[in-house]
């Protein structure tokens, strides 16, 4: 039987150390990635609700009453097919799974809602 000497290659210990380092880096990156998605979704909701609130205000000026549905704003928006993002977002300082599939209008307060909440409810708690 021949013995192999001076051959370059990876040892099992070396491979385990490399895999361990990659696993540690993944554990650090995944929560930051999840947080970034929730922040992006929150920013999108804030933007959509602000845009809808502006359209509602202009609609009220033109028509003297609040719109009943988002589709009533078709002359004031590029598209009335605005939908909330899916996944997590920050609502009242907590990370929550977004359940809304559409934005709605609160006629009593003349504002757009997502998950029954106004734009002011979507924020991340400051640390």
Residue ranges, per PLM feature:
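Aliphatic-rich helix starts adjacent to a transmembrane/signal segment
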Residues: 32-51
